[in-house]
Amino acid sequence: MIKHLALAAVAASALVAATPALARPMTATDMHMMHRFGSPSISPDGRRALFTLSNTDLAKNKRNNPIHMLDLTRPGATPQPVAALKGAHDAMFGADGAIYYLSPVRGRDQLFRMPMGGAPVQMSDFGADISGYKVSASGNRVIVWADRPDCPDLACAATSFPAKSAGSGRVYDQMFVRHWDTWVEPGTKSRIYSFAVIGGKLGREARVTGNLIGDTPSKPFGGGEEIALSADGRMVYFALREAGRIEPSSTNLDIFAAPADGSSPPVNLTDANDGTDTQPTLSPDGRTLAYVAMARAGYESDRHVIMLRDLATGRTRALTQNWDRSAGSVTWAPDSRSLLITAQDVMEAPVWRVDVASGQVVRMTGNGSAGNVTATRDGGAIFTQNSIMAPDDLFRVDARGRVTRLTDVNRALLAQLDPVSFEKFAFAGANDARVWGFKLKPTLARGKLPIAFVVHGGPQGSFGNGWSYRWNSRLLSAPGYAVVSIDFHGSTGYGQAFTDSITNDWGGKPLEDLKRGLAFATAQDPQLDANNACALGASYGGYMMNWIAGRWPDRFKCLVQHDGVFDQRAMAYETEELWFTEWEHGGKAYYEDPAAYERWNPVNHVAQWKTPMLVITGEKDFRIPYTQGLASFTALQRRGIPSKLVVFPDENHWVLKPHNSIQWYDEVFGWMNRWMGAQPIMRKN
């Protein structure tokens, strides 16, 4: 029953073979110097790919995003910067092969069109900043979205923000008050505006969203995937959650259809579903609208089922109802007979093909985390893929599932770094259910390895076989640590029942899984030093550090707690997306069922705390406000427990700025080395 698998061995061996004799440990600076792919746009003839390939300017503490082109017809071709697009962004191919992009003119982004081999032409003269755009395949319609007050057109909105008081006070009479890392501007929403293209310029304008009050795309993370424009430019489909007093407790995004010329109000196509409906995606033949839906209202981690709506009849069917995985991105194949999607499966996130007629799902790619999938005319796709070993590169898969690497943009830097080995394992977790985990070890290390026991956030999530520029498992192993992580009950990629099992059980089965998983890993691998471990986690993982401090206080030499919940009662009233904390505790507000929150409340067990803890938080974190971190630190200091507090005034729930990230790793490594010993790596001659 218990299985011990060495997966990703090919990738690990390849890295070892490429590593020079004088390899060195990876650093946080190395991580930030990696080139990062933007979403690729493929030319209609399939011969070229257009994308950003960003780099870090440490002196300016920011990333640059130059646009590159790759010749897909030439094996071994390397991405080349497009000189004509210097300073531009959001570049994409149109159906006619021309390149559309945004570029600043007198301090404000404008839309340009550049035919291949021709000169760019400015199409717009926007009087206000926009957030994004789409161009119809016919080229006769452009839609843009932008944060605007209630105003009928973009130009009016530029001068119609509400007059402000001479005082500095923000005034609200309903939530949201703040969202993610931003104080909400009352009356301002992300709205869609549509322009007819006349003589190569943007002409007649209309507001597509009509009198709807809500953000489209949704905030804080929605983008162009939530908006679709028909090929003929006549119809717009978009996801929107109607704003109101209950918005912070509602996950009810709906799909609306509206004429692009604003001639009639939007129509709600998914009014019957109180859960989330999003990612409207039109088939190439224009007959079918695909989208993903979650059935349960108030639950942001319900299964993503692909729905198909016949646009002529309105008939809708659940294509993947019988497939127990959640669809990520959704892309139509050119023949409209299948969909290419991404979905997590046991720590991997490959590309899958879904047959539209039967709903049959076939895996197309191997291990790693795929994204940015674009279907190709030969039945395959071009996509980005990363792994725990390396960041994104561009790949191609054909209709038979044969994968070809198209780029290797970080090869030179990766070749300098110490190799690592990655291994997945399964064990009997809580209730003897099958639970998965992984270990990552520096291949050159000898002797016993201290353990960095990393707990993922979400809690509905998975670190898995993927690259992160925040919690990077390969980097965490660099000083000579064995990184161990467990996909406890509640994790994603194992079926919906497993994901659901954490609801109302935050400190129950997950903690039991962590205990059993660490015991299994150390019993299976004698190189792991079971008596020398530190635990680390952020968000739910940070909550788990606070929970471990009181409920498993003798196991670890130190804890690293980032943006974790300390007091469930305060969290219930301080966080902004109320649907999350309410669903996780049985679907009720704190005042309706205090016992559900107090059952798993770390603050109730502070008297048992004794493990040294590093606490990290960001002042702009409105998801788990920084006051939760201050409270943890106060408890530690009041009890005389060795502790340290790091506060980033300019970061949110994530640490994103390069120098802040480097400081984060310096503090984390310093804390672990203090309690687990000095730099432990020992090199072979």
Feature-to-residue mapping (PLM):
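Short glycine/acidic-enriched loop and turn motifs that connect beta-strands
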Residues: 55-59, 105-108, 149-152, 243-246, ...
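Active-site-proximal cap/loop segments of hydrolase catalytic domains
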Residues: 485-685
